[in-house]
Each structure stands twice: as C-alpha cells, then as structure tokens.
Amino acid sequence: MTNIRKTHPLLKIVNHSLIDLPAPSNISAWWNFGSLLGLCLMIQILTGLFLAMHYTSDTATAFSSVTHICRDVNYGWLIRYLHANGASMFFICLYMHVGRGIYYGSYTYLETWNIGIILLFAVMATAFMGYVLPWGQMSFWGATVITNLLSAIPYIGTTLVEWIWGGFSVDKATLTRFFAFHFILPFIIAALVMIHLLFLHETGSNNPSGIPSDSDKIPFHPYYTIKDVLGFLM
C-alpha cells in the first residue's frame, strides 16, 4: 500500500516541501535561520492573538489595557514579554538570514529574493505599528517622527501624512488603524512566506560551496528536520 503522505492531495504538498525534499548535503547552521523565522512568526501570531483579546485601541484606555494584561490576565505578563522579545529575536534571525543570503549569493534567485525583500519591509512595517500600540510617550513620538518622514515628498507629502494620521495630528484614528494593520499584516506575511518557499523549491537552495549540488542531495527529513529542531531548542 502506497504511503498516504505520497498520495493524499494535501499531505503530498507537505511531503514534497518538508519530507522528501532533495536538499544539499553540506548546508551549515547559517541555513537554520529560515526555520527559526517560521517559528518566530508562529509565536508572534499566537501571542498577538491572545494580547488582542485584552487590548483596546483607544487613546484613553490603550496604556491601561496593556497594564491590565500584565497585572490581571493569567500569564498576561509572560504573553506580552514573549511577544515583545519575540519581535527582537525575529529581527536578529531576519538580519542573519539576509546576511547569509548576501554572503552566499542567494540574490541570484530573483523571485525568491524579491519576495524576501517584500517580507522584510512588511515585517518592519508591522513592528513599527506594534511599537505605537501601547500608547506611551515613545509610542506617540515614534508614530509622529516616522510618519512625518512622508512629508518630505514634494506637493503631496503633507496631505499624505494627514491621510495616514486620519486628522491633523497623531490621535485616536491613527491608533485604531495602526492596530488593524498590525493585526492583519502577520497573516499577509504568512501568505508571502508560502510564496517565498514556493519560489525557493522551484530552484532549490544554494550551499556554502557555491557550486550546483544536483549530484549530491539528501532528503530533508530526517537530516534537516532534526537540525532545525536543534536550532529551535538552542
């Protein structure tokens, strides 16, 4: 009887992407950051979902709701700090991943690289909007300074800034829309990750030697699944 993972329409996709995927035999720990980014994204979406259940995107109560999460919600302090420090870890892994791509010439895979650039900008936008949400002094300052950069655009700059703010200054409308975008963007990022992997699997990964590895491939599972799990544990 044929293995179900090779015949079932859905499991077949997973099988070709994570189990029977032919991978170069010599990729180093620098290739671990892709899977670590996937883990970070999952942690951010899960912790963010629970935080959103208790957060209020109103200028009068936003800061109080964050305090309430830390003081009154069961393990709210842990969820918040996982989300905040998870974001820092996300960017550490992201810069390592991009750095490896530059060093080992991954930019030659144009489609994969371009989707990666879009992912980088999307993650930066999400992080910026998340920084604004607690509505402390630094949140207000950050929102004002970064959005004001758009006022440097000739002719339409001022109008554009006021359009993003939803008024003549950073206020309730700004906070509400930033929360809405901060909530939806991670799901868009997850969809872009799928496209990123789709393009990567079209060409195959590069390797530290920089030469084609078609003659020397090994299955992704168990070799690289174990390597990735070791990366998660570390």
From Swiss-Prot:
Heme b b562 binds at residues 83, 182. Binds 2 heme b groups non-covalently. Its main location: mitochondrion. Changing residue 203 to S: In strain: Isolate NK 4504. It is found in: Mitochondrion inner membrane. One of its GO terms (molecular function) is metal ion binding. Heme b b566 binds at residues 97, 196. The chain crosses the membrane at residues 33-53, 77-98, 113-133, 178-198, 226-234. Its cofactor is heme b. It comes from the Eukaryota. One of its GO terms (cellular component) is mitochondrial inner membrane. CDD domains: Cytochrome_b_N. Keywords: Electron transport, Heme, Iron, Membrane, Metal-binding, Mitochondrion, Mitochondrion inner membrane, Respiratory chain, Transmembrane, Transmembrane helix, Transport, Ubiquinone. It is a multi-pass membrane protein. GO terms for biological process: mitochondrial electron transport, ubiquinol to cytochrome c. A ubiquinone binds at residue 201. InterPro entries: Cyt_b/b6_C, Cyt_b/b6_N, Cytb/b6-like_sf, Cytochrome_b_N_euk/bac, Di-haem_cyt_TM. Heme 1 (or BL or b562) is low-potential and absorbs at about 562 nm, and heme 2 (or BH or b566) is high-potential and absorbs at about 566 nm. The cytochrome bc1 complex contains 11 subunits: 3 respiratory subunits (MT-CYB, CYC1 and UQCRFS1), 2 core proteins (UQCRC1 and UQCRC2) and 6 low-molecular weight proteins (UQCRH/QCR6, UQCRB/QCR7, UQCRQ/QCR8, UQCR10/QCR9, UQCR11/QCR10 and a cleavage product of UQCRFS1). This cytochrome bc1 complex then forms a dimer. Belongs to the cytochrome b family. Component of the ubiquinol-cytochrome c reductase complex (complex III or cytochrome b-c1 complex) that is part of the mitochondrial respiratory chain. The b-c1 complex mediates electron transfer from ubiquinol to cytochrome c. Contributes to the generation of a proton gradient across the mitochondrial membrane that is then used for ATP synthesis. This is Cytochrome b. It comes from Lepus alleni (Antelope jackrabbit).
